[in-house]
Amino acid sequence: MDLAKFLCWIVLLLGISLVESRYMVYNTSHTIVPGKLNVHVVPHSHDDVGWLKTVDQYYVGSNNSIQVACVQNVLDSIVPALLADKNRKFIYVEQAFFQRWWNEQSEEIKRIVKELIHSGQLELINGGMCMHDEAAPHYIDMIDQTTLGHRFIIREFNVTPRIGWQIDPFGHSAVQAYLLGAEVGFDSVFFGRIDYQDREKRYKEKTLEVIWRGSKSLGSSSQIFAGAFPTNYEPPPGGFYYEITDDSPVVQDDPDLFDYNVQERVNAFVAAALDQANITRINHIMFTMGTDFRYQYAHTWYRQMDKLIHYVNLDGRVNAFYSTPSIYTDAKHAANEAWPLKTEDYFPYADRINAYWTGYFTSRPALKRYVRVMSAYYLAARQLEFFKGRSQKGPNTDSLADALAIAQHHDAVSGTSKQHVANDYAKRLAIGYVEAESVVATSLAHLTKVDPTLNPTFQQCLLLNISYCPSSEVNLSDGKSLIVLAYNPLGWKRVDIVRLPVVGGDVSVHDSEGHEVESQLVPFTDEYVALRKYHVEAYLGQSPTQVPKYWLVFSVTVPPLGFTTYTISTAKKTDGYSSKSYVSNILKGEQSIINIGHGHLKLSFSTDQGTAINYVNGRTSMTEPVKQTFSYYSAYNGSNDKEPLIPQNSGAYVFRPNGTFPINPEGQVPLTVIHGPLVDEVHQQINPWISQITRVYKGKEHVEVEFIVGNIPIDDGIGKEVVTQISSSLKSNKTFYTDSSGRDYIKRIRDYRSDWKLDVNQPIAGNYYPINHGIYLQDSKKEFSVMVDRAFGGSSIVDGQVELMLHRRLLLDDSRGVAENLNETVCVQDKCTGLTIQGKYYYRIDPYGEGAKWRRTFGQEIYSPLLLAFAQQDDGKPMSFGAASFSGIDPSYSLPDNVALLTLQELDDGNVLLRLAHLYEVEEDKELSGVASVELKKLFPGKKIGKLTEMSLSANQERSTMEKKRLVWKVEGEGSYGEEKKAKRGREIDPRKLEMELYPMEIRTVLIHLELPSSHSRINRFDA
């Protein structure tokens, strides 16, 4: 070969080599390297289950004029991206989306996805239907929505989620740490939002990662490793966003092209890693590579991350690799480090000065109430579905379960979505209710054993909150009777009051044995008539055909997990009529003091002040001056703010008051006082848009306050946040107690945080906390407790005083993404007015140390009200009940006073899911904080418990298996296994004795297989 040909050949080879060099095989196979800084690259997408768009719009990618987001694309594109490189990983959270997608896939895709999950490339973490909020949901709802997701995952993939991933909720509940963390089998929980002052201190002390011990009762037995991200849940600083619409610099590694920047991007990555390492213990850090609705075209992300991992590892200063939070947690655990201890919770949350996210504790109070009502209904409906037997083809409670699960999302019940999305959440609940209502009606017909030829139909009244109940508003003058069935979902016998609108006054009430029951007629007032008419037209599109004259009030006694029936009919001459109430309108100066109350409790009102002034309980010798008032905070307009650059308004998330304005009665408004044998009431019209009724019931030792707030006026261009204050003389010393998601109570001190020295810049908003269950004050002699009917925000801004925020109507957005002011309206045809809220709270004063029993017991009654159903009975055609009363448990038995039934549910496979909860904390009550014992046999009378398996809280694995897998963490200042004195837990259930022990704050979950007599079909579970 001559020289010329040889040189040509060499040039050709070099040319081929140069062309081929443009195809790179990136090395993504690195794993943990001891001694180096290990950067765990965690690809994820945060997919809100509704926020700016509805859940379905987000899934299919519609309504993109609001936000370009399509979760279907995310999941579609992740699968081939993972298949392209076995080292790539991805985590997914929201089961509401994943299950929609899964149900649409072919068997081949399902097989591939299962392989990806089992290989660890795709990890399902958190595992609930949504990433639930932690301020507004009740703990039972949090458990239910998590269970729904976890049981799907174990059924389809035979895996159990290990990691909590609460990266976006706006503050974090202690219940999340121990109940929805450790008790569901999680080894760690990660989140993005903690107070900016707290975060700054944790930067300096390297305490972003802690051992979180959320329950003082369960202690180290339910602690969890918890990590707060350095900033949020997004990629690290330096420009690492790779959605096709993002503008971060890509890794341009082709030297033949302009803008080659490999070293520049490596340097940015390493700099971000070293910065994060400086605030993190142990040589492992996590980069959260993703944010809201990312990976819609997954290859754009993985192409860049492949390059980064490849070139960063060639650089050698740090070690980068694809990872998951599970791998990260195991690495932290393997270091055998002792970690700082965190107790209590992460409320309230502020992301900067003057920006406390405490407004959403109250935002959309009607939706919050609707969620709570549906939660209680679902609990009762599942019980009745079990008693009858779950239908395999007909209506069931699944639709309501799904709707409730989605409603727990941190932009749903929180009240922080756009209005059309809030409407969608409510619509889903309404659809779920209709199907569950059918389940309840057929179950009750089955259990009452009414002659089916009579075509028995039990109606229900969902709109009693607006005083509308067609079933009770029937004309009984023609000889008809109304059957009222009251079902008690609690595990105790219950004596309660029923209030129903009726059209006539000559009625009497009889129990199932024909004995007359004492009753009272309370006149229907103007505020009820107006509220009823407007909202019936708004919701049903038609006006009520008649106006009730009275509320019929009577007392019912109902067995545990059972019902009793009552008959309302036209009073016969031999009957005693329902007692009409004595009504008086008292003007200022006519009578200085008015007293109401039956039995031990007396409440005094001042006509001069127009408010309650004195509370007296003769049984406990408690006498206390009280005063209840209304105020509003004008919403701050941040347009004049100089710092920060973005003005801070009060909005759906943020509460920023700009002055407090008392709301006083306009002119001389009379107190309308109603006296009767069962209840005394004081009606007050505070102003044209606020009214309230204060009630004291016979035999009860608490005060009930029903309020109506709205239409809040905004003609002055100022948003308003309406609060009520209940004042006492208690010397509470800046201290008060609020519940954690309806479970434990946490001590709060005004203007103080236990974890850092608080810089007080918002003395009102910065002292607000979420209230799901109640709030109380105490001094050395007394306890003052207030219980609520939904999630509210509240505080004790002044010693001796409880403050609740009841309603918000705002005209500005707070710049947190929703881009819509919180101005809810209700429309009749083309006329819209501000939303009116009706609700209740309750208060009571007890000797010091004795208030817990009322809070815990009555709290259960508030959460689980009686379920009422109605049937008409024609004269001459009596409805013959085979069972006019019923109890689903042994008639001689009830649950202990300190135990609540959380779940009684028949599952698809015929097994029964049972959850029981100890209601008290350690040392909360002298007697009821002790160990409780439940005889499980007596919960299933006449049935044999064939097999019983104790499960994790979310019922996706045996508890014994979960405990064996649990990681044990060291805590600074403690021994290797935490506290020397561990919290007590109930003993293993003996399969012969079948007794369950529960210690304070313990919840135990069991799966039960019932062996039914062969002569009984599955759906005739409670035939006589």
From Swiss-Prot:
Zn(2+) binds at residues 46, 48, 168, 410. GO terms for biological process: mannose metabolic process. It is an enzyme of class 3 (hydrolase). Coiled coil: none annotated. Residues 1-21 form the signal peptide. Disulfide bonds join 461-469, 827-832. Liberates mannose from p-nitrophenyl-alpha-D-mannoside in vitro. Belongs to the glycosyl hydrolase 38 family. Homodimer. This is Probable alpha-mannosidase At5g13980. It comes from Arabidopsis thaliana.
